[in-house]
């Protein structure tokens, strides 16, 4: 207790007071550990009171490092201390809560804590290490210069606990190290880590693994710094790269034993991968040593993995790290695969993978085999089987990682991969034949893995066989392997995979062979089959429908459709969640095969889908799959009448039910389904949809306080207005209000300043559709809507809401420019100036952030029209407005930290509106050019690399690479995204109103280029060009201005 007494004295508090607080703290900690709930709750309240006292942290530190203290109290004190440091040590911290620890207390805590790193109890030691590292993040080197000397002394002390404690601090500290600390850290830490890593006789495997992990963390960090400060790597890491690399090469060759195991090799491989990724130029010379050794690790690990995991013919103990985490052997396999991915990502090393493809793919297939553990889990839990084997699974196993690697090489080297895979599969199948004949039971797993591999990349295989680029006996594979395996009963997983594989290769089959496989697939659905076979049969059916629709040979499927439908409905009745989703997805595609068949079965399909939708009403995935089925049924005219008779009353009763009587979210989903039906039905719509569903959705939207219901209600009314405005306008209620009146009520509600701003996220689309369809009939109402939009804009904070509102004005620029300008000039904005100024300021400050291809086109072309009008009509209303131009940075400011930003708020230039519009148009052109260029850079271009200059140290190539993505700001990447096709896959492309708009078809790059070229010819252009910056001039140069 001497340390505690000294601390009490140091803190300047009189002994008894300090002692009293400390005793209170011990009592409180004891209370928190109590099994009695009331006592615990009271103690947790009490700790909040003590937390704000000056001595709280000091007492926690004393209790933590007191070897005489009770173990439970010490552990709890160490955990609370760790939290205390996070929240009170430094006011700059994101988690900070006042008060800040006083200087006096900090000195005492820094004095006490390092003793805890020698602690024999690992949990206490780890918590102390965490606290020391968190303090060091703020205090080292200025306030705690001696810390690193202390840690280094511990590392060489020979005391195992002290070594572990110090390594824990360094591990945590380097993860959070700042770029101002790194130049001080790297020269001290890295040489020490090298010593620890290479002194196998002094330090244990886990400590040496930690040393490598710390090296890897530093390597990544220094690479990130290099982007901002050129030359950082040269000073901080290059001096040690060579010696580390040589040591890594040595370490990978040591067989497992007292100084090496799979966990250790995994860390070493991660380090080598980090070097290859971050400093490829520096690694070129070492590659000849590294590659054969990693290759050996890959091949030896494969044999070991097959024995211990796939076939489980050999028991092994997995290593455990110093925190008790099990380091499964699969982690080593993951890091080998990561290394290969890193080679693929770099043009310097890519061709090494290309040369090794036949062997590499042979081993990938070994790693793709099903393990005994998976057989056990999947047999017991079919849901898990569906989830793990799904293309978009979140599971991560060696099998999945091997598939990922196969797909990566197949994408990068299509022709070579096809040949390599054909050769590897042929070799495996021949070897499996020998294994099978010798009576070994696991031969089928290789068959399954070969089918999985070939089926995963089926397109490159079938194309290459068709073009004669590879010699692969496709017919032999289909009949002697897949069909033959279907007649064996070795494993349900082989049967299932064979059904799936067959469905991938219909293009290579004769109609007779397809029929044989379809017969087998339908039998596979049968209730007597194991779940895994039935599930695989469902996947196969999806494949057949998909493939045979593409090749226009669905007639082969027709005779099997009745039994397929029955099989699917039976299966859905027996399973929920994952299996059910798969069945629904497949049922949906089955509905599209033959409209006549689907119509004849509507009485089965529709009631089933409604029942499933109601039973799983709280599952959004099931709801959306049910919606897809209703969509398909709506598009078949013969199904429309009967389906609406069944479905619409159900949806109406949900919309009319009191909110507390139905599950949350059900009403919003019901409205969504109604929208789908309306959108996919050809007008005129039935009485049921107009006289029952329309009023129900309008009333429901007006009387709900649920955001999702309001949003979906607005979208549903937009569908009605878009599909059949006349019918909406003709219908009226008993009071004589017609459908348009109701739509107006809903618009007002969505824009009401009192409702949440998120209800307005789609209101812009509703208003724009309303204006485009009913423009002239709106009269006074239009002014009313626009006023509401202006007031909503003054409260909106979210970009999506603001964009939705501004888009209404953008659409009006296209259709009613002059009336719009008049209207906006007749109203005052929030500052008293005309509302036009407010709208243009909001629009121009956000245009570069807008997302969505369609929105991008509408707003960009509208800006062109505004600029053109402002010049041609010499319109003072636009010419006199000034808006924010560009941010002004002072030259001596350096890096803009939070504290600097607080002292010096942002400053902007102030420029004429029309100049700002020109700048935005140029920016849009730049973005769309970049997106188009990226889209045209097909993978074929990337894989043309000259293998002969492989090892040459190319300065230029390096420069180009570094200026690639690394130099882009996140904002740039986000800005270009609105024109990237695949960025918003589900965005407006499926919005029918956008698709119908001629603006959507515009080639924006051509339009903007043309506009700017014409604009540059105008006499006024001289005045504009003086305002352009270098970037903008460069963009204009690319189009010849």
UniProtKB/Swiss-Prot annotation:
InterPro entries, per the entry: ARM-like, ARM-type_fold, HEAT_IPO9_central, Importin-beta_N
Sample GO molecular function, one term: nuclear import signal receptor activity
GO term, biological process aspect, one: proteasome localization
Alphabetic keyword roster: Acetylation, Chaperone, Cytoplasm, Nucleus, Protein transport, Transport
UniProt entry tagged with the keyword Acetylation: yes
Annotated spans, Disordered: 936-967
Role according to the record: Nuclear transport receptor that mediates nuclear import of proteins, such as histones, proteasome and actin. Serves as receptor for nuclear localization signals (NLS) in cargo substrates. Is thought to mediate docking of the importin/substrate complex to the nuclear pore complex (NPC) through binding to nucleoporin and the complex is subsequently translocated through the pore by an energy requiring, Ran-dependent mechanism.
Quaternary context: Interacts with histones H2A, H2B, H3 and H4. The binding is coupled to RanGTP cycles. Interacts with AKIRIN2; promoting association with pre-assembled proteasomes. Associates with pre-assembled proteasomes; interaction is indirect and mediated via interaction with AKIRIN2. Interacts with PPP2R1A and PPP2R1B.
Protein name stated in the entry: Importin-9
């Amino acid at each position: 207790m001497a340390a505690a007494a000294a601390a009490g004295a140091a803190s300047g508090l009189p002994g008894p007071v300090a002692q009293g607080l400390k005793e209170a703290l011990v009592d409180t900690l004891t209370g928190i550990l109590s099994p009695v709930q009331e006592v615990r709750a009271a103690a947790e309240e009490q700790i909040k009171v003590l937390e704000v006292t000056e001595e709280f942290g000091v007492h926690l530190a004393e209790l933590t490092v007191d070897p005489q203290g009770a173990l439970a109290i010490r552990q709890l004190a160490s955990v609370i201390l760790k939290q205390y440091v996070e929240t009170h040590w430094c006011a700059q911290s994101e988690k900070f809560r006042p008060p800040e620890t006083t200087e006096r207390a900090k000195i005492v805590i820094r004095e006490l804590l390092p003793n805890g790193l020698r602690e024999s109890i690992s949990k206490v030691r780890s918590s102390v290490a965490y606290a020391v590292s968190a303090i060091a993040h703020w205090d080292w080197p200025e306030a705690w210069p001696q810390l690193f000397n202390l840690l280094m002394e511990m590392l060489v002390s020979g005391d195992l606990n002290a070594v572990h404690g110090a390594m824990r601090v360094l591990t945590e500290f380097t993860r959070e190290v700042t770029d101002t600390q790194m130049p001080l850290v790297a020269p001290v830490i890295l040489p020490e880590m090298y010593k620890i890593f290479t002194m196998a006789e002094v330090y244990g495997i886990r400590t040496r693994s930690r040393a490598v992990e710390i090296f890897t963390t530093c390597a990544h960090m220094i690479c990130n710094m290099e982007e901002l400060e050129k030359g950082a790597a040269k000073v901080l890491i290059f001096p040690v790269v060579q010696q580390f690399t040589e040591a890594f090469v040595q370490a990978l060759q040591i067989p497992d034993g007292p100084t090496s195991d799979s966990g250790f090799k995994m860390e070493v491989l991660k380090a080598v991968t980090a070097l290859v990724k971050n400093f490829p130029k520096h690694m070129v010379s070492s590659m000849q040593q590294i590659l054969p050794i990693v290759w050996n690790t890959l091949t030896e690990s494969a044999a070991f993995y097959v024995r211990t995991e796939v076939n489980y013919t050999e028991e092994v103990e997995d290593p455990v790290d110093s925190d008790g985490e099990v380091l499964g052997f699969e982690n080593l396999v993951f890091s080998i695969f990561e290394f290969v991915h890193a080679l693929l990502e770099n043009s310097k090393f890519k061709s090494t993978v290309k040369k090794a493809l036949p062997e590499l793919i042979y081993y990938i297939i070994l790693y793709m085999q099903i393990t005994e553990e998976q057989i056990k889990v999947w047999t017991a839990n079919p849901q898990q089987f569906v989830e793990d084997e799904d293309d978009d699974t979140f599971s991560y196993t060696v099998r999945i990682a091997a598939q990922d690697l196969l797909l990566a090489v197949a994408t990068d080297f299509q022709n070579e991969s096809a040949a390599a895979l054909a050769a590897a599969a042929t070799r495996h199948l021949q070897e499996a034949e020998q294994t099978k004949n010798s009576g070994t039971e696991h031969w089928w797993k290789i068959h399954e893995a070969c089918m999985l591999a070939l089926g995963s990349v089926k397109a490159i295989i079938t194309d290459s066989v068709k073009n004669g680029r590879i010699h692969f006996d496709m017919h032999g594979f289909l009949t002697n392997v897949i069909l033959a395996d279907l007649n064996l009963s070795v494993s349900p997983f082989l049967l299932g995979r064979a059904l799936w594989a067959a469905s991938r290769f219909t293009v290579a089959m004769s109609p007779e062979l397809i029929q044989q496989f379809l017969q087998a697939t339908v039998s596979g659905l049968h209730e007597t089959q194991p779940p895994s076979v039935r599930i695989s049969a469902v996947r196969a059916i999806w494949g057949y429908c998909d493939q045979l629709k593409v090749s226009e040979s669905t007639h082969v499927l027709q005779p099997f459709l009745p039994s397929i439908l029955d099989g699917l409905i039976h299966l859905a009745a027996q399973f929920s969640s994952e299996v059910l989703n798969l069945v629904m997805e497949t049922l949906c595609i089955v509905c599209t095969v033959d409209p006549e068949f689907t119509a004849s079965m509507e009485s089965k399909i529709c009631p089933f889908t409604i029942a499933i939708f109601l039973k799983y009403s709280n599952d959004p995935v099931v709801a959306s799959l049910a919606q897809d089925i209703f969509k398909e049924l709506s598009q078949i005219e013969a199904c429309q009448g009967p389906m609406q008779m069944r479905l619409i009353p159900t949806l109406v009763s949900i919309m009319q039910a009191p909110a507390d009587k139905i599950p949350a979210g059900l009403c919003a989903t019901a409205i969504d389904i109604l929208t789908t039906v309306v959108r996919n039905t050809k007008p005129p719509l039935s009485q049921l949809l107009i006289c029952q569903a329309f009023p129900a959705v309008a009333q429901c939207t007006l009387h709900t306080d649920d955001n999702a219901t309001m949003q979906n209600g607005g979208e549903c009314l937009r569908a009605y207005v878009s599909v059949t405005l006349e019918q909406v306008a003709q219908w009226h209620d008993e009071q004589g209000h017609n459908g348009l009146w109701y739509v107006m009520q809903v618009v007002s509600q969505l824009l009401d300043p009192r409702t949440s701003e998120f209800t307005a996220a789609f209101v812009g689309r509703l208003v724009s559709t309303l204006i485009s369809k009913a423009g002239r009939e709106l009269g006074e109402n239009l002014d009313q809507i626009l006023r509401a939009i202006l007031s909503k804009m003054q409260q909106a904070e979210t970009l999506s809401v603001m964009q939705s509102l501004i888009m209404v004005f953008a659409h009006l620029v296209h259709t009613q420019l002059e009336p719009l300008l008049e209207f906006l000039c007749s109203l005052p904005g929030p500052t008293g100036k005309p509302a036009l100024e407010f709208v243009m300021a909001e629009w121009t400050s956000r245009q570069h952030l807008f997302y969505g291809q369609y929105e991008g086109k509408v707003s960009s072309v509208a800006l062109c029209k505004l600029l053109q009008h402002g010049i041609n009509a010499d319109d003072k209303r636009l010419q006199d407005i000034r808006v924010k131009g560009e941010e002004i940075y002072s030259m001596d400011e350096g890096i803009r930290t939070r504290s600097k930003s607080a002292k010096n708020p942002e400053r902007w230039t102030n420029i004429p509106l029309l100049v700002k519009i020109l700048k935005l148009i140029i920016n849009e052109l730049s973005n769309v050019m970049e997106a188009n260029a990226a889209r045209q850079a097909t993978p074929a271009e990337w894989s043309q690399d000259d293998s002969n200059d492989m090892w040459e140290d190319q300065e230029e190539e390096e420069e180009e690479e570094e200026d690639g993505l690394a130099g882009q700001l996140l904002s740039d990447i986000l800005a270009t995204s609105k024109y990237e096709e695949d960025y918003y896959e589900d965005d407006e492309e499926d919005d029918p109103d956008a698709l119908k708009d001629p603006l959507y078809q515009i080639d924006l790059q051509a339009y903007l280029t043309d506009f700017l070229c014409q604009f540059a010819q105008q006499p006024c252009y001289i005045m504009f060009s003086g305002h352009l910056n270098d970037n903008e001039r460069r963009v204009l140069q690319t189009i010849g201005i």
